[in-house]
Amino acid sequence: MAQINHVSVNALNLDESVRFYEDLLGVERIPTPNFVGIPVQWLALGRTQLHLFERDIQPTSHHHLGITVDDVEPVYRAAERWDAFD
């Protein structure tokens, strides 16, 4: 059966974005290749990886990432602490 291996996301501030996903979802940092001139960090989220690249964020017509969690309340509170809602 096929499955998604990873999702790549651009981040304006890599360190802050890594801390956000660590706090919000409990992701773990995993070995990350060196991309010359581009700060990057790979994260493990269950069997799927999240690849963060520090780059400018370009507008898109549609984007979102759906994640299943065991208990939505603590995740929602963490997202509020990070001011993650538009």
Predicted region positions:
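Eukaryotic phosphotyrosine signaling hubs
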Residues: 4-6, 62-64
